[in-house]
Amino acid sequence: MYKRKLTASDLLLIIVNLIPLYCVWFEGWSASEVFLVYCLETVIIGLVNVLKMASVTLFVRKTDTWENGGRSSMQSGWFFIFFFIIHYGFFVFIQTQIFFAVSRLIPNGSFLGSYAKIPALLGNNGKLMLIIFVAYYTVQTLFEFFTSGKYKTVSMGRLMFEPYIRIFVQQFVVILGSIFLNFGAGKIFILIFVVAKIFFELFINFNRFLEIAEKRERLKKEREQQI
C-alpha cells in the first residue's frame, strides 16, 4: 500500500505544492485564494482524466468491459466517458457547494452566480497557481500515462475510477481547512494541509487499492465460472 521509491514526478509534485505554501507564509498570498485553487484541483484532475479516457477510446480500443451488479457487457469508450462526466461532475458539484457554504468565501447567490464569482475571488496569485497546477498535471500525464505506455493497457473501468480515492482524501481536508479560514487560521492550516497532501500523494499507493479491487473481482468471476 506504500510507495518506497520517489520518482522525478514525485519531486515535481513536492515543488508544485511547496510554492503556494511558501507564497502564503512569506509573500503575502491569500490563504483563501490558495484553498480555492486546491478545491478547483478536483476539476483539473477530472478534465485530465476525460482526456486520458478519450485518448484510449480514439487510439487503443473503441469498446471495453463494463461491470454492473456482477454482470459484464461491452460498451463504447464514449459511454464510459459520458458516465464519468455525469458521476464525477455531480461529485464536484456537491464538494464545491459544501466548500462554498463552510468557507463562506462566496456570498449566497444563484447557482450560476456562485461559480461566476470564482475568477474574481482567485485574484492574480490564485490564477497563477491554477496555471501551475494545470502545467503540472499536463506534464505528469505526458510522462506517466503516454510516454510510459500505460494508455495501451489500462482498462476504461480502472481509468474511470482512478481519481476518486485521492480526491476523497483531498476534498475532505480542503473542506476541513475551510473551517479554519473562518477563524483566521488559514496560514497554519495550509501548512498542515500541504504537508498532509504531500505525504498522502508520495507514500500512499492509491493505485494499489484499485489493483486489489480488480484482483478480487477477477477471483470472484473465476469462482463463479467454476460453480
Regions found by a protein language model. Give the residues of each.
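The first (N-terminal) embedded transmembrane alpha-helix
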Residues: 8-24, 34
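Alpha-helical transmembrane segments of multi-pass integral membrane proteins
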Residues: 75-103, 123-140, 165-169
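Membrane-interface interhelical connector segments
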Residues: 101-123
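Short, highly charged, low-complexity non-transmembrane loops/tails of multi-pass membrane proteins
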Residues: 207-227
